[in-house]
Structure formats: structure tokens, C-alpha cells
């Protein structure tokens, strides 16, 4: 039986990968990461099927349409997002969509009225996103995200390869701009989440998402009026859970 990867091993590997490959084009990063990790613990991609999701999914599909695509169904997504998820997966021929749900017992105990977001948005995200995310990535050695540095100040220094506990998180689009995103969407005739047309430039659960006002950053419509800027699936809370996995 192979030894379980240790967080320090992942930290060293992520630094080495970022130094060696972090400068490459996004498509090249996706291809080399799939080839590296597919048979070494496995690799998946996490997607919200939100405003910017189509680009990374198209790149993944170009390499391996059977790669697991992990979608966190919080139970509070816009109906448009669920419909878009199914349409885009069909467009791209993605054959391994994995839908992950919150634990029903946690919802019953902590959010029986489906209104926890009003009183404790952090706990709501922990139950509906962070804990399910930790379960979703547990079988894999690495996973892709579509995060970009320009999206928010909290992401400005984000590396392409980074360690999360004993696993590697890969952000192939880290250096991309909104112009890069738009050009790729046009060049490949990719379907867009219909909510984008209504000003939703970052799309999460419907109670905590609103259209972005002119001049604001893309994620300003998330948890508007709160200091909160991330749901937690990209923060240290996830690392603590994945370390325990």
C-alpha cells in the first residue's frame, strides 16, 4: 500500500511545479497536469458552472472528456445555473459530472429553515460548500479551479500550483484577464451562463448573489454589504478538512 501523501510533500511539489510550469499557457498547464496526475492519485476539476466556467471546462474536455467534473449542489443555486450546467456539459461532451450535496443531517441540525445565510453566512458556506468540497476532492491528488488573480484582491498573489493539505490545487487561468476570457469564449463559441446578461459576473447561491455595479470588481456581488469575500472552499478551512481526510 502506498504511503499517504503528506502536506509537506505537496508543498514542495507545488513549489517545484509552479517554478517549472507556472509560466506556461493555460492549455499547456491543463494538459501536463492531467497527464501527470491522472495515474498518480487522480485529478478532477471543480466547477461552479458560473460566469467564467466554460473556458476551463473546454480546455479540460479538449484533453479528457471523462475527467471528473465536481459540482457542489448547495441546494440554493439559481435554476439558470443548474440548467446551464447540464447544457454546457452536453455541449462539451463531459461524461463524468459528479454532483456533491451537503450532508442532510448537517442541514437538518444547523439550517432546518434554509435561512442560515441571514444570520451566519460563514457557517452556511461551511455546511453547504466547504465540507462537501473536502469530501469531493478527497479521492484525488490534484484538482483544477478556474480562479483568476484579477477577480479579487484576495486572489491577487495566487500561484498556478499550490498545496492544499496533501493535495495540489491548480489554477491554470490565474494570469488571465477579462479580455482573455472574452476572446477565448468568442473563438470557441462557448455557451455563457444566462445570468451574466443580467449583470451577475460572479455567480453563487441565489440568496447571497446580486448583480455587479459598474466599476466594481467581479466578485462584489457576492455577500454584498459583508466583509466576506470567499465562500471558504479556497481558504485554510478546506485545508484543515482535507488534512483530516
Swiss-Prot record:
Main location: cytoplasm
Highest taxon above the source species: Bacteria
GO biological process: hydrogen sulfide biosynthetic process; sulfate assimilation, phosphoadenylyl sulfate reduction by phosphoadenylyl-sulfate reductase (thioredoxin)
Disulfide bond annotation, renumbered to this chain: none
One cellular component term from this protein's GO annotations in UniProt: cytoplasm
Pathway connected to this protein: Sulfur metabolism; hydrogen sulfide biosynthesis; sulfite from sulfate
Biological role: Catalyzes the formation of sulfite from adenosine 5'-phosphosulfate (APS) using thioredoxin as an electron donor.
Record-given protein name: Adenosine 5'-phosphosulfate reductase
Amino acid at each position: 500500500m502506498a504511503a499517504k501523501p503528506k502536506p509537506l510533500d505537496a508543498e514542495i511539489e507545488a513549489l517545484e511545479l509552479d517554478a517549472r510550469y507556472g509560466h506556461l499557457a493555460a492549455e499547456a498547464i491543463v494538459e501536463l497536469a492531467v497527464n501527470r496526475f491522472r495515474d498518480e492519485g487522480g485529478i478532477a476539476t471543480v466547477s461552479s458552472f458560473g460566469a467564467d466556467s466554460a473556458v476551463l471546462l473546454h480546455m479540460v474536455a479538449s484533453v479528457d472528456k471523462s475527467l471528473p467534473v465536481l459540482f457542489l449542489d448547495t441546494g440554493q443555486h439559481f435554476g439558470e445555473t443548474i440548467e446551464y450546467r447540464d447544457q454546457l456539459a452536453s455541449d462539451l461532451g463531459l461524461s463524468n459530472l459528479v454532483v456533491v450535496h451537503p450532508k442532510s443531517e448537517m442541514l437538518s441540525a444547523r439550517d432546518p429553515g434554509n435561512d442560515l445565510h441571514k444570520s451566519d453566512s460563514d457557517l452556511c458556506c461551511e455546511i453547504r460548500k466547504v465540507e462537501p468540497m473536502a469530501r469531493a476532492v478527497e479521492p484525488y491528488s490534484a484538482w483544477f479551479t478556474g480562479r483568476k488573480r484579477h477577480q479579487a484582491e484576495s486572489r491577487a498573489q495566487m500561484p498556478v500550483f499550490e498545496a492544499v493539505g496533501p493535495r495540489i490545487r491548480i489554477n491554470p487561468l490565474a494570469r488571465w484577464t477579462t479580455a482573455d476570457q472574452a476572446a477565448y469564449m468568442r473563438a470557441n463559441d462557448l455557451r455563457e451562463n444566462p445570468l451574466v446578461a443580467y449583470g451577475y459576473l460572479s455567480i453563487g447561491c441565489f440568496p447571497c448573489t446580486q448583480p455587479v455595479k459598474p466599476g466594481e470588481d467581479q466578485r462584489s456581488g457576492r455577500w454584498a454589504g459583508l466583509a466576506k469575500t470567499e465562500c471558504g472552499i479556497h481558504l485554510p478551512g478546506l485545508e484543515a478538512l482535507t488534512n483530516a481526510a
